[in-house]
Amino acid sequence: MDQYLTVNVVTPDGLVYDHHAAIVVARTTAGEIGILPKHAPIIVPLTIDEVRVKRTDSDTHVDWIAVNGGIMEVRDNVVSIVADSAERERDIDVSRAERAKQRAERQIAEAKEKEDTNELKRATVALHRAINRIKVSKHS
């Protein structure tokens, strides 16, 4: 393949992902976007969701990455994702994600009972992150 994308995902903890890809699909605040080689330069905010990367080294291999917010910049066939946190499907500890989901559900119930809107928002984000990690882990 003459044209490909270089994809890297970086978090405050360091580099999470670095490969060549034929296409990258991510969810932005405006909806899903697919990035192919020669895409116009763009910077978009990402939501808590999965990023799909179809690699160039296999016609069928897709890498799945749980991304918890951040931004994606596309320029000169380089897709750079700077995320609050991110995990590849193979690195997700499902039991830990399940515990985080249960903890967030408890916190949501407690926040509703106390009518604590700030805690409700925090717990809701934690729940979305846990659900996203669980969803992405099922692709491995």
UniProtKB/Swiss-Prot annotation:
GO terms for cellular component: plasma membrane; proton-transporting ATP synthase complex. One of its GO terms (molecular function) is ATP binding. Its main location: membrane. The keyword rRNA-binding does not apply. Signal peptide: none annotated. NCBIfam families: ATP_synt_epsi, PRK00571.1-3. Produces ATP from ADP in the presence of a proton gradient across the membrane. Belongs to the ATPase epsilon chain family. This is ATP synthase epsilon chain. It comes from Enterococcus hirae (strain ATCC 9790 / DSM 20160 / JCM 8729 / LMG 6399 / NBRC 3181 / NCIMB 6459 / NCDO 1258 / NCTC 12367 / WDCM 00089 / R).
